[in-house]
Amino acid sequence: MSTVGREEASPLLPSTAEPSPSRVTLEEGGVGSAGDLDMVPTRRDKLALASILIGLILVLSTSWYLVFSGNLKEMGWFAVHPPMQSLAITAFLLGITPLQPPPPNSTTKKNRFKTHQSVMLGFALPLLAIGSSAMIYNKYIHGAKHFTTWHGKLGLITVIWVILQASIGAASVWGGGKAFGGEEKAKRVYKYHRLSGYLLITLMLFTIHLAGIHSDWANGRGYTNLRILAYYIGLPLIWLGIEIRSR
């Protein structure tokens, strides 16, 4: 993945320092800022963003329809789980997109990074916590075993990973990166935080695929063609868009 490779030249961590004035000569003979080459959204980036949004619409609308077209009373607390988790993944993805591609200057970088933090802490994490808690409580009140399917097991891994991801990300930027021995060391940690984030998104999408296609509940709801559209087409569209926009 190219996420890590170029980070030395243009780290995403907010900094009061301006980008390096170093210049590079382009193959065509022109001269440009080294950091600007990959930071301006291209037509490809915009098409990739459209791919993400189309995929999200398919997944979000299908997940909600499967729940709210059924008997909510019979579903009980389970009815909270799919809507909240689908909103959580939406928030995670929307929290990432302001940083894709990396902003071209320190002011824009800081503003977009604040947006990233606000979406993650204010929406994505709380929604994930609500959706996961509802599922755990639903299992508890029915005396059902936890984490017996691949969806459940990967869901647990995802939640733990999210907690670690958020903790490391916060530690790498708050307080000037003191938790990792200073800003420079924190920047190196942050590179791998970003890489970990892309891998985490992949795991999230696969976990949703297992729920939407292979779970007993989803199969019991029917709507096979709709689920294929959302979870066999929509999810790959999201993943492809995220990967194309990564740097």
Model-based region annotation:
Residues 2-247:
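Membrane-embedded alpha-helical bundles that constitute the cytochrome b-like, heme-associated redox core
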